[in-house]
């Protein structure tokens, strides 16, 4: 069901308006001295001081761990996990898919301490495709104004006229995960698949879950019944089509709740990212679709290796969920506190199919 925390410490600079060099986007040659890009924008001052002679706070020659019984380790893991399963068996929001859209959605939701969020991720490693940029390269490109979200997370980047570049995509994914999972109202269930939906009276009311390895082997074994997780709102962020992709909307089609899943169209970055954010919505009662799964249900273009729409689509999905729950949100003007400019841009309710 994949949709798709350490922060980079780099030299900070003064103004967001200063440019290190004129963008070479249109082919202008760069000076050799500028071929090694340096960050020209940092979200916070760099107060880190590292000494090469610093030693660990213990003697590495005589180090020994405190003793422990093996059964204690087993009990600690089992007790805590089972407690989480009991706690989140009936929850406010289930986010299916922990890619960049799903993580951004859960992060935004978790700011409200009254909302309980469960994240279901079929992979052992959450993050979806957001551990790398395009073609397995390292850098992550984010178009403005989505960089405001990166500022909130405290992630450094190189700033250009209309976009920013994080030196490694893993910095975004690890940072948002570490901040998100530290919050008391969030639980990530990774290596867990959402096999089906709970539907009552025409409304999605939760998900049917199973261990991911069990879900992948139903053809080889029998009698491996699932479990369930009820939720007031389900956010489907299962990514584009694939073995575990777009499974939320594909299931809606198979049970007759939507008419078709036309699939995403050919790549067009400019129209794709705007369309993904604009078309993020509650597609059937109780189920919100976000991220690249939006392109699958609406026939919007694919965006390729740019990630801003994933973040802002996730944020919009969170505020749609808050609205559904009767909580303050940025879409109807009831949100308390500062609202990101990009969320105002994302507040359109139009469900118009994108024209590729």
UniProtKB/Swiss-Prot annotation:
SUPFAM superfamilies: FAD/NAD(P)-binding domain (SSF51905). One of its GO terms (biological process) is thiazole biosynthetic process. Gene3D superfamilies: 6.10.250.2840, FAD/NAD(P)-binding domain. It is an enzyme of class 2 (transferase). Binds 1 Fe cation per subunit. Substrate binds at residues 101, 121-122, 129, 194, 225, 240, 292, 302-304. Residues 1-51 form a transit peptide. It catalyses: [ADP-thiazole synthase]-L-cysteine + glycine + NAD(+) = [ADP-thiazole synthase]-dehydroalanine + ADP-5-ethyl-4-methylthiazole-2-carboxylate + nicotinamide + 3 H2O + 2 H(+). Involved in biosynthesis of the thiamine precursor thiazole. Catalyzes the conversion of NAD and glycine to adenosine diphosphate 5-(2-hydroxyethyl)-4-methylthiazole-2-carboxylic acid (ADT), an adenylated thiazole intermediate. The reaction includes an iron-dependent sulfide transfer from a conserved cysteine residue of the protein to a thiazole intermediate. The enzyme can only undergo a single turnover, which suggests it is a suicide enzyme. May have additional roles in adaptation to various stress conditions and in DNA damage tolerance. This is Thiamine thiazole synthase, chloroplastic. It comes from Citrus sinensis (Sweet orange). The gene is THI1.
């Amino acid at each position: 069901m994949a949709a798709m925390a350490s922060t980079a410490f780099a030299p900070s600079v003064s103004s967001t308006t200063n440019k290190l060099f004129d963008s070479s986007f249109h082919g202008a040659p760069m000076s050799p001295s500028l071929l090694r890009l340096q960050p020209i924008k940092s979200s916070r001052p760099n107060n880190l001081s590292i000494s090469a002679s610093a030693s660990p706070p213990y003697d590495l020659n005589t180090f020994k761990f405190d003793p422990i019984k093996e059964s204690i380790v087993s009990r600690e893991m089992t007790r805590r996990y089972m407690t989480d399963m009991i706690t989140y068996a009936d929850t406010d929001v289930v986010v299916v898919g922990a890619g960049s859209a799903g993580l951004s959605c859960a992060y935004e939701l978790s700011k409200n301490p009254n909302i309980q969020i469960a994240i279901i991720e079929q992979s052992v490693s959450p993050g979806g495709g957001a551990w790398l940029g395009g073609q397995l390269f390292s850098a992550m490109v984010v178009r403005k104004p989505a960089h405001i979200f990166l500022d909130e997370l405290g992630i450094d980047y190189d700033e250009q006229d209309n976009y920013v570049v994080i030196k490694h995509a893993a910095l975004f994914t690890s940072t948002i995960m570490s901040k998100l999972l530290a919050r008391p109202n969030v639980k990530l269930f990774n290596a867990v698949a959402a096999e089906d939906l709970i539907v009552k009276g025409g409304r999605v009311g939760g998900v049917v879950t199973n261990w991911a390895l069990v879900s992948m082997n139903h053809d080889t074994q029998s009698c491996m019944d699932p479990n369930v997780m009820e939720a007031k709102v389900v956010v489907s962020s299962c990514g584009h089509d694939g073995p575990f992709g777009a499974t939320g909307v594909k299931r809606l089609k198979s049970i007759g709740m939507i008419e078709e899943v036309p699939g995403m169209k050919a790549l067009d970055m400019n129209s794709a990212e705007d369309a993904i954010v604009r078309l993020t919505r509650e597609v059937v009662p109780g189920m919100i679709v976000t991220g690249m799964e939006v392109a699958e249900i609406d026939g919007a273009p694919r965006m390729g290796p740019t990630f801003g729409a994933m973040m802002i689509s996730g944020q919009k999905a969170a505020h749609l969920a808050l609205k559904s729950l009767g909580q303050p949100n940025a879409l109807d003007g009831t949100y308390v506190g500062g609202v990101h400019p990009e969320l105002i841009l994302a507040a359109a309710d139009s469900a118009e199919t994108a024209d590729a």
